[in-house]
């Protein structure tokens, strides 16, 4: 398989499912008969039974009836394709047919049952079993999973399911999906986990014909990179890509009862499948100069698989019931056309974007860093030897050189153990030195503290170096674990037995294929040899044989006429659909032209027409951006400036109006002048505390200003010395009553006269102090 043929045809197989319970209850007849040995499928038209219409017969590479087993289908049809992918070819397996005919069962099957597992899980086992049995080869296996839902590409392995991906194309790699996530897998369990995660995100719905109908086209991509040492001593990398495609089934709204969202999904599904049929027809028709790959994202992704660099197997799934005879015939006709598609597969050797090469270079770089670290530590280890007394001394150069070979041999036997022993020895050494410093009482406290800090720093550095080395070692092991190498952890005897069994199965499948081809060839040559060998003993025998041959030829003639009539009917139907589409597009185009001619100026129309360009990458018409380049055909004119600071030309009247009134009509800028909308007051005036009226009156009286009181006490002391009673009475006379001041508020003064006993010469008397509260 190292070299491919110049071209090879797409391999087409047909699988017919058994009658389901609904079809049995509805008493539908079985109209499909399958001849497994001859590779033929015959379909009887139930409406043509009365007119004795002959069944339509189709011949394929291989056919499988309702009694076929999953493993039988895989060994005979798909195993050679997966083997070619392991040798560096691109391969594609896709299931095609009406909804509810068993496409998903063929591709996925029942995972927990080994006998009913589909193509995808069987291919997983096949790939990793082949890798485990390989010798002197390194493999890297990556998996991606995407779906095309309503003509939008979604990554089923991404956390953000709302994100839509874009299709890109490069001359060296062809069509690819930008930013599609890819996961490196090391075993069947890991790749099955990737598949299960994607299946949980896939769009599935229920219809009248299928309770678990796929509402999107799903493509599971396995990329296998293999590195092998060539005769020139260099590593050569082969990259094979396996596309496992589970197409959504074509459906009719009258049968599925699709409504609302299901109807929209069915419309998009039928459009993409119709585009796939057009691509198949264009590839088969030698007169077609254009292949409409860009009509659908599905056909763009399958561009290499249909007429490109790939080996392709198409599984056409059909139903046996008379209820679906039209869909069955359509599927068989498309499959019959696909047999004539020619692909040109080639081995993908030493691609530029091989991830395996990057892994190998990164592993080599990390190992080099690790060897430098371990080499530096080994040199330190050889340079310093600790004596019995705890003193360090250096060895001679000759002794160091003598030890190199021994240590290298030991490291070759068990490098990891030596590195671990080295770290343990260094740690014990530092701990021993730290304890010696702690027990040495002759050192000064400051010197002891300095030495302890230095040992702690060395211990920290040692831990950091150890962690860095462990991190590098773990990284190398993790990257090496992703590179799969065969011949490990396998019992050789069991391995050889499995190889022999697989070779026997492949030989049996190849023998069946050759037998089927020989029978088909014998069937074709029977007619030619029959005429040469025929000898007649009588005229009656000759008449009987010729009559039998005539009937056979007449039945073939009727079959060919029926095929021609069906082809004409299909052509007429397709032509009517094209005419209807053309009429709708013409009507819409006339409406657009009418709007443009009546509402858009001719200059603006010409500008738009000259700027419009078709983007083949996105399959859309786009407008080229306007630039300020002087020599450009689409030069953008600058705005006329009437004055500095204004973006628009203004008249004198407009300028005066701007100054006189705040009107937005004459504003030069798109700015409105609005008054400030002040908020409501957030503070209050100060209000003093409320005081009772009596208290307020008392305070007012106490704080009122009073006139000065003059008292003549000249005779008070003279009389005070002669009569004590008089002095007492005089004292009582001059004393204010305790009742307080009168309510009138008038000031009361003590009357004085010359005859008063208080008047007279002596020391002056002063009034007593008065307060609010009597003493």
UniProtKB/Swiss-Prot annotation:
GO terms for biological process: cilium assembly; inner ear development; microtubule-based movement; neuromast development; nose development; opsin transport; photoreceptor cell development; photoreceptor cell differentiation. Residues 718-734, 756-765 have a biased composition (Low complexity). It holds the Pfam family Kinesin. Keywords: ATP-binding, Cell projection, Cilium biogenesis/degradation, Coiled coil, Cytoplasm, Cytoskeleton, Microtubule, Motor protein, Nucleotide-binding, Synapse. It is found in: Cytoplasm, Cytoskeleton; Cell projection, Cilium; Cell projection, Dendritic spine. One of its GO terms (cellular component) is kinesin complex. Residues 9-341 form the Kinesin motor domain. GO terms for molecular function: ATP binding; ATP hydrolysis activity; microtubule binding; microtubule motor activity. Residues 389-413 have a biased composition (Acidic residues). InterPro entries: Kinesin-like_fam, Kinesin_motor_CS, Kinesin_motor_dom, Kinesin_motor_dom_sf, P-loop_NTPase. It comes from the Eukaryota. ATP binds at residues 97-104. Residues 501-591 form a coiled coil. SMART domains: KISc. Microtubule-based molecular motor that transport intracellular cargos, such as vesicles, organelles and protein complexes. Uses ATP hydrolysis to generate force to bind and move along the microtubule. Plays a role in cilia formation. Required for photoreceptor development. Belongs to the TRAFAC class myosin-kinesin ATPase superfamily. Kinesin family. This is Kinesin-like protein KIF3B. It comes from Danio rerio.
């Amino acid at each position: 398989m190292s070299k491919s043929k110049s071209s090879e045809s797409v391999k087409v197989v047909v699988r017919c499912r058994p009658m389901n319970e609904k079809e049995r209850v509805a008493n539908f007849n079985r109209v499909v008969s399958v001849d497994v040995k001859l590779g033929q499928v015959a379909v009887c038209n139930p409406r043509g039974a009365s007119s004795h219409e002959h069944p339509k017969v189709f011949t394929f590479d291989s056919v499988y009836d309702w009694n076929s087993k999953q493993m039988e289908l895989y060994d005979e049809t798909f195993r050679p394709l997966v083997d070619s992918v392991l040798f560096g070819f691109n391969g594609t397996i896709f299931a095609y047919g009406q909804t509810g005919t068993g496409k998903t069962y063929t591709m996925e099957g029942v995972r927990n049952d080994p006998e009913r597992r589909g193509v995808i899980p069987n291919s997983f086992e096949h790939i990793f079993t082949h890798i485990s049995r390989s010798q002197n080869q390194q493999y890297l296996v990556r998996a991606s999973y995407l779906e095309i839902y309503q003509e939008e590409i979604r990554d089923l392995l991404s956390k953000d399911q709302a994100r839509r991906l874009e299709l890109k194309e490069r001359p060296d790699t062809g069509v690819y999906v930008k930013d599609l996530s890819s996961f490196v897998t090391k075993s069947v369990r890991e790749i099955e986990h990737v598949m299960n995660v994607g299946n949980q995100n896939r769009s599935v719905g229920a219809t009248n014909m299928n309770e678990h109908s796929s509402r999107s086209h799903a493509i599971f991509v396995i990329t296998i990179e293999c590195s092998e040492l060539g005769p020139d001593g260099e590593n050569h990398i082969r990259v094979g890509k396996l596309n496992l495609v589970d197409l959504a089934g074509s459906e009719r709204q009258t049968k599925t009862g699709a409504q609302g969202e299901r109807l929209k999904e069915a419309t998009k599904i039928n459009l993409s499948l119709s585009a796939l049929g057009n691509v198949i027809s264009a590839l088969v028709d030698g007169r077609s100069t254009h292949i409409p790959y860009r009509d659908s994202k599905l056909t763009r992704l399958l561009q290499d698989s249909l007429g490109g660099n790939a080996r392709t197997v198409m599984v056409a799934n059909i139903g046996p019931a008379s209820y679906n005879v039209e869909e069955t015939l359509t599927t068989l006709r498309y499959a019959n056309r696909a047999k004539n598609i020619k692909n040109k597969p080639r081995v993908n050797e030493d691609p530029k974007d091989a991830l395996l090469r990057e892994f190998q270079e990164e592993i080599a770089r990390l190992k080099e860093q690790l060897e430098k670290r371990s080499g530096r530590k080994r040199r330190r280890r050889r340079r310093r030897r600790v004596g019995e007394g705890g003193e360090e001394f250096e060895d001679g150069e000759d002794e160091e050189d003598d030890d190199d070979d021994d240590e290298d041999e030991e490291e070759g036997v068990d490098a990891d153990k030596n590195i671990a022993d080295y770290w343990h020895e260094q740690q014990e050494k530092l701990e021993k030195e730290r304890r010696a410093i702690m027990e040495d009482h002759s050192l000064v406290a400051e010197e002891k503290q300095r030495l302890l800090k230095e040992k702690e720093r060395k211990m920290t550095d040692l831990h950091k170096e150890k962690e860095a080395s462990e991190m590098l070692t773990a990284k190398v092991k993790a990257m090496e674990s992703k590179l799969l190498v065969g011949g490990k952890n396998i019992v050789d005897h069991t391995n050889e037995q499995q190889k022999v069994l697989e070779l026997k199965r492949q030989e049996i499948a190849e023998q069946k294929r050759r037998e089927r081809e020989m029978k088909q060839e014998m069937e074709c040559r029977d007619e030619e040899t029959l005429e040469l060998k025929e000898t007649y003993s009588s005229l009656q025998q000759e008449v009987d044989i010729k009559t039998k041959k005539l009937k056979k030829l007449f039945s073939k003639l009727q079959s060919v006429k029926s095929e021609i009539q069906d082809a004409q009917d299909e052509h007429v139907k397709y032509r009517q659909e094209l005419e209807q589409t053309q009429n709708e597009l013409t009507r819409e185009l006339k409406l657009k032209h009418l709007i443009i001619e009546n509402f858009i100026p001719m200059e603006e129309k010409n500008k738009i027409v000259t700027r419009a360009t078709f983007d083949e990458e996105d399959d859309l018409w786009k407008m080229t951006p306007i630039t300020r380049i002087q020599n450009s055909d689409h030069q953008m004119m600058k705005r006329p400036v009437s004055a500095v600071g204004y973006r628009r030309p203004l008249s004198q009247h407009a300028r005066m109006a701007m100054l006189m009134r705040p009107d937005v009509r004459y504003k030069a800028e798109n700015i409105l002048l609005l008054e400030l909308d002040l908020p409501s007051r957030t503070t209050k005036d100060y209000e003093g505390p409320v005081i009772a009226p009596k208290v307020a009156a008392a305070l007012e009286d106490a704080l009122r200003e009073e006139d000065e009181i003059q008292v003549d006490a000249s005779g008070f002391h003279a009389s005070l010395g002669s009569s004590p009673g008089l002095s007492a009475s005089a004292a009582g006379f001059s004393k204010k009553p305790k009742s307080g001041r009168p309510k009138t508020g008038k000031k009361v003064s003590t009357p004085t006269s010359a005859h008063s006993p208080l008047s007279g010469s002596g020391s002056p008397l002063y009034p007593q102090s008065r307060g609010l509260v009597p003493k």
